[in-house]
């Protein structure tokens, strides 16, 4: 099908509103994407006419809700080309998924003297859980350094691996720089050293197809709210043999086989033993609707449109005086920048006055900010519903701020 940004925009109610008397230009989808009516309606319809607690219920509503939930798991497995739906765990988001791996697989497999490798461009969600794990067990955290252009110093990677390396935890796409890391070669190198690989896919799955079998990663995790779905729901993919070996992290209902005060508790099989308690079933229904929506548009069509828009944006931003861009020329989704010596918060506030929504701050990537020696950056993110006109408004807004502030 032919991609039409006008038709896409018509599906997103919020894009028709005004901010400060001007049409909203929402350039903050990397933080959280807006939701199409199809997702909003699917979740609302479930709560209106189909809601019930899933699992173990013999009545019709419960059985139907359980079936819908498991059908979404199957749809999500197809979306990332997992071998089986039983390789997917429903989590609250990327952060919980990484913490689950750190506390389940990590506690069982990382020992004193071992090491874990991350990079200098990671989101805090892919740093802090590993710092906590290393502190608990006495392991070492090693870091792949950045280059000034926002790529990783991959030539250093072979020197970081040794026989004690247990895990490479790496972002697919940087949430600040838009850098897409060369996962295939990184994963191959890690496996050659006997290490597992976790990929933070939070900033990748909305921009192009992801094939976890082709990548051969051991763990892949992403949030749905950045993929035009609801908040509070995400997917953790784990290779099936690995997942079945992992102990549960949280205890409670739904994740048990038997509970006895005298003989202890036994667990149900994965993935359900990692889904303690009543799940966010409405969010899961919304997840299914979001996957259906982007799949109907075609991720390859989305990728082509977004890349053309990104190239246009980068070329137009060259006209803004004193603008510093961070990250490589070839990037996905985001453009981080600072204007002269003005604080990112000030620039972001002026842009908001012009109806333009960008993200400002350290973007949960303080080590990256420290590398560039700045306290904060502005970040404009481009999604499938953004337009060339909105890019022009961003450029004009920055030019106007430069004239006002000098």
Swiss-Prot record:
CDD domains: SufS_like (cd06453). It is found in: Cytoplasm. One of its GO terms (molecular function) is pyridoxal phosphate binding. Gene3D superfamilies: Aspartate Aminotransferase, domain 1 (3.90.1150.10), Type I PLP-dependent aspartate aminotransferase-like (Major domain) (3.40.640.10). GO terms for biological process: cysteine metabolic process. The modification N6-(pyridoxal phosphate)lysine is found at residue 226. GO terms for cellular component: cytoplasm. Its EC number is 2.8.1.7, 4.4.1.16. The keyword Cytoplasm applies. Its cofactor is pyridoxal 5'-phosphate. Keywords: Cytoplasm, Lyase, Pyridoxal phosphate, Transferase. Its main location: cytoplasm. It catalyses: (sulfur carrier)-H + L-cysteine = (sulfur carrier)-SH + L-alanine; L-selenocysteine + AH2 = hydrogenselenide + L-alanine + A + H(+). Pathway: Cofactor biosynthesis; iron-sulfur cluster biosynthesis. Cysteine desulfurases mobilize the sulfur from L-cysteine to yield L-alanine, an essential step in sulfur metabolism for biosynthesis of a variety of sulfur-containing biomolecules. Component of the suf operon, which is activated and required under specific conditions such as oxidative stress and iron limitation. Acts as a potent selenocysteine lyase in vitro, that mobilizes selenium from L-selenocysteine. Selenocysteine lyase activity is however unsure in vivo. Belongs to the class-V pyridoxal-phosphate-dependent aminotransferase family. Csd subfamily. NCBIfam families: PRK09295.1, sufS. Homodimer. Interacts with SufE and the SufBCD complex composed of SufB, SufC and SufD. The interaction with SufE is required to mediate the direct transfer of the sulfur atom from the S-sulfanylcysteine. This is Cysteine desulfurase. It comes from Escherichia coli O6:K15:H31 (strain 536 / UPEC).
């Amino acid at each position: 099908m032919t991609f039409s940004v006008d038709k896409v925009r018509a599906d997103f109610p919020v894009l028709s509103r005004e901010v400060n008397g001007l049409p909203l230009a929402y350039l903050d989808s990397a933080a959280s994407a807006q939701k199409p009516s199809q997702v909003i309606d699917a979740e609302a319809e479930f709560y209106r006419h189909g809601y019930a607690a899933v699992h173990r219920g013999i009545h019709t509503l419960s059985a139907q809700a359980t079936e819908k939930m498991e059908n979404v798991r199957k749809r999500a497995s197809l979306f990332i080309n997992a071998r089986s739906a039983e390789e997917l765990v429903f989590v609250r988001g990327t952060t919980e998924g990484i913490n689950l791996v750190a506390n389940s697989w990590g506690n069982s497999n990382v020992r004193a003297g071992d090491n874990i490798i991350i990079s200098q461009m990671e989101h805090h969600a892919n740093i802090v859980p590993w710092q906590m794990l290393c502190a608990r067990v006495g392991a070492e955290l090693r870091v792949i350094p950045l280059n000034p252009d926002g790529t990783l110093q991959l030539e250093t990677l072979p020197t970081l691996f040794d026989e004690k390396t247990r895990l490479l935890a790496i972002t697919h796409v940087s949430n600040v720089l838009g850098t897409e890391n060369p996962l295939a070669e990184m994963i191959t190198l890690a496996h050659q050293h006997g290490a597992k690989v976790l990929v933070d896919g939070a900033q990748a799955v909305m921009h192009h197809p992801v094939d976890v079998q082709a990548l051969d990663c051991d763990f892949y995790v992403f949030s749905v709210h950045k993929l035009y779905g609801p908040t509070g729901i995400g997917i953790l993919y784990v290779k099936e043999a690995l997942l079945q070996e992992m102990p549960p992290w949280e205890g409670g209902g739904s994740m048990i086989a038997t509970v006895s005060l005298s003989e202890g508790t036994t667990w149900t099989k994965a993935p359900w033993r990692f889904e303690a308690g009543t799940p966010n079933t409405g969010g899961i229904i919304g997840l299914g609707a979001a996957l259906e929506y982007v799949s109907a548009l075609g991720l390859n069509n989305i990728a082509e449109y977004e890349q053309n828009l990104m190239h246009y944006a980068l070329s137009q931003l060259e006209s803004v005086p004193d603008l510093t861009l961070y990250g490589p020329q070839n990037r996905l989704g985001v453009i981080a920048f600072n204007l002269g010596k003005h604080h990112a918060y000030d620039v972001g506030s002026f842009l908001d006055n012009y109806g333009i929504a960008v993200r400002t701050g350290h973007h949960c990537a303080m080590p990256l900010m420290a590398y560039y020696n700045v306290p904060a950056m502005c970040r404009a993110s481009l999604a499938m519903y953004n337009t060339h006109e909105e890019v022009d408004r961003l450029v004009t807004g920055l030019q106007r701020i430069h004239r006002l502030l000098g």
